[in-house]
Amino acid sequence: MITKLIKNNDLLFEELYVAGPHVFICKKHPLASKDLITAEDLQPYPYLVYEQGNNNSFYFSEEFMSMLDFPKNIQVRDRATLFNLVIGLNGFTVSSGVIDSKLNGSNIIAKPLDINKTMRIGVVKKKNTVFSRYACFYMDALKKYLSIV
């Protein structure tokens, strides 16, 4: 769906990073000592996802696992609430594994998820658009942070 929208709207996707999916959990979570977490391991715990709004942007969800059915789901609107519930409820979310302890603190950790999928992280922009000097600076910093320069 997203590929079709990119093509039909004269957009370009620039891939920055390919990530294996990771589970974000509290460092005191019962699964925190595992090197690799399975979907089955996660069944007893609440799955925290971002609310996608009224226009149903399900297909743009950063949580590609939103297509899977977990028995306990909680929708949140912001990162702070999500991380508070990850800690307070032994919940989890799934993302790229890129996490910054300076921004998020040291209580949240990322563990690889045992699933044969990848996540393509990138930037969508209008074709023939030239980034401003500040946008170029930001992109360079982002690529450096992702260690792909």
Give the role of each language-model region.
Residues 64-74, 107-108:
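A local structural motif
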Residues 28-38, 115-117, 128-134:
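Short helix-loop capping/hinge motifs at secondary-structure junctions, enriched
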Residues 3-4, 49, 69-78:
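Short beta-strand-to-loop elements that line the ligand-binding cleft
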Residues 8-15, 19-20, 81-129:
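Beta-alpha-beta core module
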Residues 40, 120, 124-149:
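Extended ligand-binding regions for polar small-molecule ligands
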Residues 11-21, 25-47, 51:
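Flexible hinge/capping segments at coil-to-helix
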Residues 45-68, 131-136:
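Secondary-structure junction motif
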Residues 9-10, 36, 76-79:
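Structural motif corresponding to alpha-helix initiation and N-cap regions
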